[in-house]
C-alpha cells in the first residue's frame, strides 16, 4: 500500500512541478528519502506507510509549514515565495543578518504585484499575455529592478545576476501556469 501511495504521489509531483517548483522539489526529495530509508531497512513498513501518507496529504493539499499565512490563498504567490526562499537559503548560508522567510515574503508579494499589474491591465486578464514578448520583457525588467534595488542593495543579500535570473524566469514561468 505504501508503494502505491508513494508511486501515485511521485506521479502527481511530476505532473504539478511547473506550478510550484520549489514546493514540489522539496516534497519529491522527502519522498525519495523515505523510499530509500525503507529500502535500506532503516524504517519499518508501518513508518513507511505513515510517512508516504503524510507526504501525499501535504502534496495534495499544497500545504507546507514554511509558507506564511498571508500567502495561503495565493497559489502563484506561494510559488514565488518558494522560489525566492530557495535562492536566499542558498546564497545566505550565514543567515544571521537576514530573516529569509520575511525577505522571501516581501519578494513574493512584490513579484505578485508586478506580474498582476502587467497581466490585469483593466482588472481583466489580458488575452494571450504569455505570447507578448515586449510585455514579458518589461515585466522581467521590473522584477529584476526590485531584486537589485531592494533585496540586493537595501537588504544586502549577495545575489548574482544568475540568481536573479533564476527567480525572475521561474516566477514568470509559474505565472504562465496559474494565469491563463
State where each predicted segment sits:
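Catalytic cores and motor modules of nucleic-acid processing enzymes
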Residues: 1-180
Amino acid at each position: 500500500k505504501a508503494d502505491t501511495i508513494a508511486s501515485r504521489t511521485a506521479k502527481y509531483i511530476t505532473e504539478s512541478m511547473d506550478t510550484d517548483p520549489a514546493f514540489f522539489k522539496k516534497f519529491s526529495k522527502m519522498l525519495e528519502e523515505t523510499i530509500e530509508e525503507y529500502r535500506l531497512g532503516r524504517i519499518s513498513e508501518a513508518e513507511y506507510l505513515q510517512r508516504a501518507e503524510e507526504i501525499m496529504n501535504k502534496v495534495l493539499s499544497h500545504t507546507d509549514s514554511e509558507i506564511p499565512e498571508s500567502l495561503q490563498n495565493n497559489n502563484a504567490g506561494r510559488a514565488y515565495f518558494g522560489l525566492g526562499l530557495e535562492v536566499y537559503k542558498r546564497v545566505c548560508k550565514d543567515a544571521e543578518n537576514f530573516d529569509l522567510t520575511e525577505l522571501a515574503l516581501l519578494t513574493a508579494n512584490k513579484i505578485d504585484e508586478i506580474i498582476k499589474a502587467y497581466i490585469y491591465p483593466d482588472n481583466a486578464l489580458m488575452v494571450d499575455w504569455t505570447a507578448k514578448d515586449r510585455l514579458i520583457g518589461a515585466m522581467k525588467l521590473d522584477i529584476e529592478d526590485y531584486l537589485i534595488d531592494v533585496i540586493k542593495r537595501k537588504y544586502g543579500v549577495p545575489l548574482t545576476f544568475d540568481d536573479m535570473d533564476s527567480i525572475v524566469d521561474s516566477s514568470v514561468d509559474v505565472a504562465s501556469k496559474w494565469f491563463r
